[in-house]
Amino acid sequence: MQFERSDRVSEEIKKELSDIIQHDLKDPRLCAELISIVKVNMSKDLRHAKVYVSIFDKDKEKVETTMKALENAKPYIRREISRRISLRFTPEITFELDDSIEYGARISQILNQLNIPKEDENIEESEGEEEN
C-alpha cells in the first residue's frame, strides 16, 4: 500500500501537536492529560490541517473552555510546527471536537449492561446437558 505525502505529513503533525500540547502549552484552561489528538486530515496541497481533538471530561463547559484555549494557542502551535517540521508552507490549523471515543465508551457500557452470558459458559452448559 502506497502512502501519500499528505498521510505522512499528517502523522508527523499529529505527533508534534501531541508533544506541544503535553509539554509546551502553559494555559491554565488546558488540562493536557485529558486532551488527545485523534486524527489529522491534511489537504492535498498541505496548506490546511483539520485536527480532531478528543477531550476526556464530562463537564461540557470545561470542554468548551479547552477548545477556546486551543483556538487561542493556534498562532503559537503553528509557529512551533513550522520550527519542528520542514515544510514549504506551514498548514493553517482547524480544531474539531471528536467525541468518537466517548461514544465508543458509551456503547461498551450499554453492551456490558445487557448481561449476555459469555460463550465459554454456554459451551460448558451444553456439554453438561449432553452427558446426561
UniProtKB/Swiss-Prot annotation:
Compartments (UniProt record): Cytoplasm
Source organism superkingdom: Bacteria
GO biological process annotation, one example: maturation of SSU-rRNA
GO molecular function, one term: ribosomal small subunit binding
PANTHER family: RIBOSOME-BINDING FACTOR A, CHLOROPLASTIC-RELATED (PTHR33515:SF1)
Quaternary structure (record): Monomer. Binds 30S ribosomal subunits, but not 50S ribosomal subunits or 70S ribosomes.
Family listed: Belongs to the RbfA family.
Protein name per UniProt: Ribosome-binding factor A
Organism in which the protein naturally occurs: Caldicellulosiruptor bescii (strain ATCC BAA-1888 / DSM 6725 / KCTC 15123 / Z-1320) (Anaerocellum thermophilum)
Gene name tied to this protein: rbfA
